Each structure stands twice: as structure tokens, then as C-alpha cells.
Amino acid sequence: FQEVSNRTADLMVDWMRVGFVHGVMNTDNLSILGLTIDYGPYGWLEDFDPGWTPNTTDAGGKRYRYGNQPQIGHWNVSRLGGALHSLTQDAEPLQAIVDSYSERFAQGWDRALADKLGLVDANVVRRREVAAELLDLLPLTETDMTIFFRTLGDIEVDEVDEVDLSVDDTT
């Protein structure tokens, strides 16, 4: 079950990293192997919009929108844990695995953003602040996700002023 939880969290990181939106993430539409399956109304983000879903039947509630996929992955892992509980009668180890999903996703998403932004060696706290600010800004400007991150790779280090990503201890 731990492997299923890890693979699901890793899959959600991969989807989010590239802007993939599954569209229908019911428990029967996710693989315990961490594979993308049964993606009927799937799509790819163009403008960075965490609220976007390609599923027109989900347009009202937007349960399966881009920005909600990690939470739905967690929900699905917890549903599997509930089903396994009926077989083992010991909820504690199952709950610990369900709880580990969020940390696994958070660490993977942090690594993915650090890679995309070229900030792998930056101070972790400051790097997360920069990434969070960027993710807040991108939807405001209707920025094409793929083009934006691809263009970052074209910037030469010597073309930009040095940015201090260390934590300011004076505040």
C-alpha cells in the first residue's frame, strides 16, 4: 500500500509538472501502479490556470481541475486504505501511509519546481517563497505554462543580475 501511495503522489507531481489534466479522477480511473489510465476528457494547460478542467461535465464544481489533482490523488489513496482496512482490521499503519502521501507529494513538487526554475541549489525556504509567488502570478497574466518554463531555459546566467535567494536573518 505504501508503494501505491508513493506512486500516486509521484504521478500527481509528474502531471502537475507538465500541465497535464486528467479530467476524471474517480478511484476506478487511477492505476495502483502509478500509471496514467482512462484519461477520457484529458487536456493540457495552456494559460496557467489552476482552476481549469477539460471535463465539461465537471465545469460547475471543477473537482478534477488542474490545481485539485494532488488532493484527489490523496482522496483516492485514502479510499483504497479504507477498503484495505476491512481486510486487516488494523487502521493505524494504513492511516500512516495515507498521511505520508501529502509529504511525498510536497517534496516531489518542490523538487520539480526547483528543477523547472533552475533553483536547485538555492535556499529551500526562499526557493519555496519564489515558487509560490510565481504560481500566484502566472494565472494573473494568462501566461502559457509550457512557453514560460521553456523560455526560462533560454536565459543565460550572465544576462541577469544576481538574485539573492538566501534567507534574510535581519527581519
Where are these regions (language model features)?
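ATP-dependent phospho-/nucleotidyl transfer catalytic cores
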Residues: 1-22, 33-124, 128-129, 133
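C-terminal, non-catalytic "cap/extension" segments appended to globular domains
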Residues: 107, 111, 132-171
